[in-house]
C-alpha cells in the first residue's frame, strides 16, 4: 500500500471508472453559486459550513464512551459492497438472498466486530439513526450542529421536515452501491474521506433499478465496477460526476440523484464517519408545469408501478402487463 499523510487518503484506493466525466463543484458557504446549485437541484460540496464541527471529536474511543447503551444496526458482508435492502420485504420474498447480514448490537460489540475484521475478510458497516438513547455529551454535540444554516436552507427551498440523521461508520473500502433516495440530503463528513459518484435522475433508464416492490427498491442492478453490458447495455451511456469529501465537507445530494459512496483508505483506525441530514422533499405544487422535470418523471414512474401492483394484486405481474401494453404499440 502506498504511504500517505496522516489525515489524508490513499490515492491507490480509488477505483477507476470509465463513466466519470466531471467533478462536482466545491464552493464556500459565502458563494451565491452554492445556493443557486441547491435551488436547481444540482450537487455541490460546501467546504465551510461548520455544520458538524462539534462532532469533530467523534472518534471510536469518544463514541464508545458517550453513545450510551442503546443498540445499533450493523451490517456485515463477505465483500465490500453494502447494497441496501428492505428487511420486511426480504422476509416475504423467499427467493431473495440478502446481500449482507443485519445485526442489532451495542457499540462495544461493534468495536469487537471491527477488531475481528482485521483478522478476516469480513467487512462491517454501522448505519444507525441518531435517537434519544445516546449519552448527554452526544446530545450536547448534536445541539451544537449549525442548525441555523440548515434550517435557513430548509425554509429557502421549501423542503419538508427533517426526517432523520443517520450515523454511518464504515471500514475503508466499504461501498454503498448506486441508488437514489426520495429525500434531500446534506451529507456531512466527520472523519476520513469518502468518494461520492453521482448520476443525474435523467439517466434512470441507464441504471436499471430493481422493481419498486423488490427488497432492493431504488437500487441499481448494475455493478459499475464490473458492468454486464450484455444484460445492461444502456449503462454504456451513463456518465457520473464525482467528489471526494473529507472532514468538514458537506455534500448536497439532491432527491432522486443516483449515488455511490466509497470509503477510502486512510490513517489508522481505518474507518470513516459521516452523518446524513435527510429532509422530506418539496410538496407537490397546486399546478403541475410541463414538461416534467427528471425528478418528477421518476416520481410518476414509481407511483404508476405501485398503482399497477395494487390493482393486479401481484407485483410480479406488473412487468408482463406493461410489456403487453407497450410492445407493438409504442415500440415501432
Model segments located where?
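N-terminal accessory scaffold of Fe(II)-dependent oxygenases
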Residues: 1-250, 258-332
Amino acid at each position: 500500500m502506498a504511504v500517505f499523510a496522516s489525515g489524508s487518503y490513499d490515492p491507490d484506493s480509488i477505483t477507476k471508472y470509465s463513466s466519470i466525466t466531471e467533478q462536482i463543484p466545491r464552493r464556500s458557504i459565502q458563494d451565491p453559486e452554492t445556493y443557486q446549485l441547491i435551488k436547481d437541484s444540482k450537487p455541490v460540496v460546501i467546504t465551510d459550513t461548520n455544520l458538524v464541527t462539534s462532532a469533530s471529536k467523534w472518534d471510536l474511543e469518544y463514541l464508545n464512551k458517550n453513545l450510551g447503551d442503546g443498540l445499533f444496526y450493523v451490517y456485515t458482508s463477505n465483500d465490500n459492497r453494502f447494497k441496501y435492502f428492505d428487511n420486511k420485504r426480504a422476509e416475504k420474498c423467499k427467493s431473495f438472498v440478502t446481500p449482507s447480514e443485519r445485526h442489532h448490537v451495542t457499540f462495544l460489540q461493534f468495536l469487537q466486530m471491527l477488531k475481528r475484521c482485521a483478522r478476516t475478510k469480513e467487512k462491517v458497516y454501522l448505519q444507525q439513526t441518531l435517537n434519544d438513547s445516546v449519552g448527554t455529551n452526544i446530545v450536547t454535540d448534536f445541539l451544537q450542529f449549525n442548525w441555523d444554516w440548515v434550517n435557513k436552507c430548509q425554509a429557502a427551498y421549501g423542503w419538508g421536515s427533517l426526517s432523520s440523521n443517520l450515523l454511518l461508520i464504515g471500514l475503508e473500502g466499504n461501498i454503498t452501491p448506486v441508488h437514489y433516495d426520495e429525500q434531500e440530503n446534506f451529507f456531512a463528513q466527520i472523519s476520513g474521506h469518502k468518494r461520492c459518484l453521482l448520476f443525474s435522475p435523467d439517466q434512470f433508464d441507464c441504471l436499471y433499478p430493481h422493481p419498486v416492490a423488490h427488497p432492493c427498491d431504488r437500487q441499481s442492478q448494475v455493478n459499475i465496477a464490473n458492468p454486464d453490458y450484455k444484460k445492461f447495455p444502456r449503462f454504456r451511456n451513463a456518465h457520473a460526476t464525482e467528489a471526494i469529501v473529507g472532514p468538514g465537507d458537506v455534500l448536497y445530494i439532491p432527491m432522486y440523484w443516483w449515488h455511490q459512496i466509497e470509503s477510502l483508505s486512510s490513517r489508522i483506525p481505518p474507518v470513516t464517519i459521516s452523518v446524513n441530514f435527510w429532509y422530506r422533499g418539496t410538496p407537490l405544487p397546486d399546478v403541475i408545469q410541463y414538461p416534467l422535470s427528471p425528478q418528477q418523471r421518476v416520481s410518476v414512474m414509481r407511483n404508476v408501478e405501485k398503482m399497477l401492483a395494487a390493482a393486479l394484486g401481484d407485483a410480479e405481474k406488473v412487468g408482463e402487463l406493461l410489456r403487453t401494453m407497450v410492445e407493438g404499440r409504442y415500440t415501432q
